[in-house]
Design a protein with these regions (language model features):
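Feature recognizes metal-dependent phosphohydrolase scaffolds
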Residues: 1-302
Length: 302
């Protein structure tokens, strides 16, 4: 069944509602067994936001290599903004079901009922399936996605960032993740926080999460024996950015020409067996802007 689904999805044809229900049930069985902080072996490729840009996801796999020849960590935000969140999620979930050890799918702030209702995914689902059943299948599944990944105990991957309420990775392991993303607290902060050139903490203008600075990152990496924190969540025009003097934090952004108009590049971060790092950049697919009729997008960058 998984092979049939993958063959269909690689042709960019959405699954039937019944097949989608089965896919989500199989994926849920896998996610239930995964921990809040999923351990991942190197070599691995770390990816940022996709936001429904299916043709650019296909370019990403061309750049990084097909699964199972390559292993991937995706740091969330698969839906909203772009035209093809359904196809993106179905393809990634089908790969997860077929090759569970070769792809890790983390939760992002858009893997939330409230956010993806407001920013396009709900409307896309009802347009493509004619009802909201698929919405229920997907959003139920979101509650089981891991919150973070740890590559060889040294590279910590999370969608947004850190929280003033924790200092260790082990504290993240204790969170009850099987719920809608809360409006505040550690779980919320991991999804919503951003770095900036400050020392410690300030309140985020997003209305959720925090802004964290170099001292916070230095302390978290030191306490937990980390070499690097990888996160996504923020558009960077060049596709990749190291933060702070110690370069112990980076943003990976994997949606080129975000919203089909930003003109930015995208990247993936390749981690080798010895944990050395290579950034590969890619630009948007010409097909991406013709993947669906234009629709109004909410002009606020979450």
């Amino acid at each position: 069944m998984e092979d049939k689904w993958l063959e269909q999805l690689k042709e960019l044809i959405c699954l039937s509602e019944e097949d989608l229900k089965q896919l989500c049930e199989k994926a849920k069985e896998i996610f239930i067994e995964e921990s809040n902080v999923q351990n991942v072996s190197a070599p691995v490729i770390i990816c940022g936001d996709i936001h429904g840009q299916i043709y650019d996801l296909i370019e990403l796999f061309k750049k990084g290599g097909e699964i199972p020849n390559s292993r991937y960590v995706f740091m969330g935000d698969y839906v909203d903004r772009g035209y093809n969140g359904v196809e993106v999620l179905e393809l990634l979930l089908a790969l997860k079901v077929k090759y569970p050890e070769h792809i890790t799918l983390l939760r992002g702030n858009h893997e939330s009922r409230q956010i993806c209702f407001a920013y396009g995914f709900y409307e896309e689902i009802t347009r493509k399936y004619g009802n909201a059943n698929a919405w229920e299948y997907f959003t139920d599944l979101f509650d089981y996605l891991p919150l973070a990944a740890l590559v060889e105990g040294k590279i910590f991957c999370v969608h947004g960032g850190l929280s003033p309420y924790i200092s260790t990775v082990d504290q993240i392991r204790l969170i009850n993740r099987k719920m809608e993303i809360p409006r505040e607290g550690v779980f919320c902060d991991l999804m919503w926080s951003d770095p900036d050139d400050i020392e410690t903490w300030i309140i985020s203008c997003r209305g959720a999460g925090w802004i964290y600075g170099w001292k916070v990152v230095d302390e978290f990496t030191h306490i937990n024996g980390l070499e690097l924190i990888c996160r996504a969540h923020q558009l960077v025009m060049e596709g990749f950015k190291y933060w702070f003097q110690n370069k112990n934090l980076c943003t990976v952004w994997s949606a080129p020409n975000y919203c089909y108009r930003c003109g930015n590049r995208a990247s993936i971060l390749k981690i080798s067996q010895d944990l050395s790092r290579t950034v590969d950049y890619f630009d948007y697919s010409e097909k991406s802007t013709t993947s669906a009729p234009p629709k109004t997008l909410v002009p606020y960058f979450l």
